Amino acid sequence: MTSNLFQPPSMAASRGAISRRTGNVKVLVSFTSSNGKTLSFSDNSFRLRPMFIGKVTEQSSCSSPNEQQQDEEQEQEQEEITVSHIKEELYEALKGINRGIFGVKSDKKTEIEGLVKLLECRNPTPEPTGELDKIGGCWKLIYSTITVLGSKRTKLGLRDFVSLGDLLQQIDIAQGKTVHVLKFDVRGLNLLDGEFRIVASFKISSKSSVEITYESSTIKPDQLMNIFRKNMDLLLGIFNPEGLFEISYLDEDLQVGRDGKGNVFVLERIEKP
């Protein structure tokens, strides 16, 4: 999953293959890793700029040490540009979809998840549970494949008088705790800061995943509890983080994770509110 998979050890290794169309771009990226396995991503449409694709530098066996150092520096610089452009395209793709909570069109979903996979292949932190300081803090959800549709949306009042605000994840590494906060705005009750709060604990499960255990949940203020009382189980069933959570991409300001049900979560780091 790390970036060196894109750097073939010799000229005999496969080079990335890219096909482009104007407008939406169909990207086919395939490469052969050092262990002989062929990895590929295809059938995903992206709106990518030409400079998005990283150049794979070939190193000749007769290159001088200085030339090899220059090649390595160029590769590192190109990789940073590539990740930067993936993130830029991802943020652009996420505009106007309200985090995907109420569903997105299939072509848009394919575009977003294709960009997420490209990011995961460039993960600068392949063993995030060994660098917990990078995980701690406050994160805001900007995309998820979890959806609230149909009767669920109606029962929770999300069609009429209840609006979803930010979905936050506050991670306390020292305590081994995570607090998930779902903000609400209820029209007519003048509640600008109502929230549904889920407290959970976590423990390291592997080099890239944690096991999350639900502990408690509350709704504030009391007026909101009166609204959601009959549908608390439904609300908790949608947003309960319990289970295995794999951190598949992590840098200073962006996190991608996948839960045990296959749902994708993209979060950006923010200052604690």
Curated annotation (Swiss-Prot):
The keyword Nuclease does not apply. Residues 57-81 are annotated as: Disordered. GO terms for cellular component: chloroplast; chloroplast stroma. Disruption phenotype: Seedling lethality. Severe reduced growth, strong reduction of levels of plastoquinone-9 (PQ-9), and loss of plastochromanol-8 (PC-8) in leaves when grown on MS medium supplemented with sucrose. Severe decrease of photosynthetic performance and higher levels of reactive oxygen species (ROS) under cold stress. GO terms for biological process: plastoquinone biosynthetic process. Residues 69-80 have a biased composition (Acidic residues). The keyword Protein transport does not apply. Disulfide bonds: none annotated. Expressed in developing roots, developing leaves, young stems and sepals. Residues 1-61 form a transit peptide. Residues 57-66 have a biased composition (Polar residues). Keywords: Chloroplast, Plastid, Stress response, Transit peptide. InterPro entries: PAP, PAP/fibrillin_dom. Belongs to the PAP/fibrillin family. This is Fibrillin-5, chloroplastic. The gene is FBN5.
